[in-house]
Amino acid sequence: ASPSTPQLGVGRVSMRKTASKTVSSGSPWYGPDRVKYLGPFSGEPPSYLTGEFPGDYGWDTAGLSADPETFAKNRELEVIHSRWAMLGALGCVFPELLARNGVKFGEASWFKAGSQIFSEGGLDYLGNQSLIHAQSILAIWATQVILMGAVEGYRIAGGPLGEVTDPIYPGGSFDPLALADDPEAFAELKVKEIKNGRLAMFSMFGFFVQAIVTGKGPLENLADHLAEPVNNNAWAYATNFVPGK
């Protein structure tokens, strides 16, 4: 008999958890003696945070990881968002860096670049008319939905043949450099990825706040701060919103 949809869902969660388990002996990032969020001053972690997965510092005051299925889903969401945040942070900084070094490709500020599609000439990807010349925001939106939907569907379904057992770390053709061949090295890379991903998500949040408050990109804000650190810093900008000022 064929399994029901709920059974398939439970099986998929269990499979992901099993496939994502890390075998790492003596690592400071895994197991009961792993590094905790407050170091030696950390309290006893919840019983369900055993140090089995990368990035587990024993901190979950809201109990978000208490349910195994919710924990598995949240872990997947965190890793995927971390990867997009790392790409996004690089995409926010790199155009500004190029522009500051004399490369001309249109608007360098990440939050202003997209608005060029509403201009009369439209938007040239990388400032090059021979690449993609976009003139319709609806067409771009539809294309993004189709492309991203196809990629996510491919990942979640396990590839065309369903041979990928772990959508978070698929391996195979997704690992052309064979970085996952050594289990110990792979376990450490998972920790590095999630740590840098969390920093990238905070960075993206900071970029959004900077854009709203200063109307400038991250490198321009950094240059302003280095030039006048007393007048250009988070505290100085925050006090501008104090009532009566």
From Swiss-Prot:
Chlorophyll a 1 binds at residues 59, 65, 78, 198. Its main location: plastid. Gene3D superfamilies: Chlorophyll a/b binding protein domain. Chlorophyll b 5 binds at residues 144, 241. Chlorophyll a 6 binds at residues 225, 234. The keyword ATP-binding does not apply. Chlorophyll b 2 binds at residues 83, 132, 161. Chlorophyll a 2 binds at residue 81. The N-terminus of the protein extends into the stroma where it is involved with adhesion of granal membranes and post-translational modifications; both are believed to mediate the distribution of excitation energy between photosystems I and II. Belongs to the light-harvesting chlorophyll a/b-binding (LHC) protein family. This is Chlorophyll a-b binding protein, chloroplastic. It comes from Glycine max (Soybean).
